[in-house]
């Protein structure tokens, strides 16, 4: 049985792909046979030019494109809108089959989400699928990637509460884009008056 981890973020462009690539590369360099999978990507002309292509190359996985990604959309909008525009909606059985194939090959698999945890994946007359539906279907725990900046506490708490409210375990949080010390070190006016 394969061990899996789902990477989500508090927002889009938060560093999920970068952190995912580092995790997979570190696992592989440490002797763990780790793979990667992403259900849907929007805003990329080809798999090679996408987040999945970056992780595949950076982490030295070198898997065929159909092993790392199920749905590629060229429009740079959320997957549910891109699917409506391009006519190729995400199907849960396709994602489940692809996940099974990846987990049969790799004992450790890191799956990267699209956008944030509440990202809609499909919205049409046949189905309403959110990212959390995929995570629950695959029974994966989540690792949250957040930007180490103003507003982070709220974004992290909101993401964790939303995830847990859907019965999905959260394994941890990684603060990305950290610049310097997170502790406020300048004394307050009150502290400056004390001798």
Question: Model-flagged regions — what are they?
Answer:
Residues 2-5:
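Extreme N-terminal starter segment of soluble prokaryotic enzymes
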Residues 16:
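Conserved lysine of the Walker
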Residues 19:
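Hydrophobic positions on the alpha1 helix immediately C-terminal to the Walker A/P-loop
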Residues 22-89:
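N-terminal phosphate/diphosphate-binding loop that engages ATP/GTP or pyrophosphate donors
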Residues 79-121:
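Phosphate-binding/switch loop-helix module in NTP-utilizing enzymes
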Residues 127-147:
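Inter-motif core of Ras-like GTPase G domains
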Residues 173-182:
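G-domain G4 guanine-recognition motif of GTPases
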Residues 184-191:
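Conserved small/polar residues in nucleotide/adenosyl-binding loops
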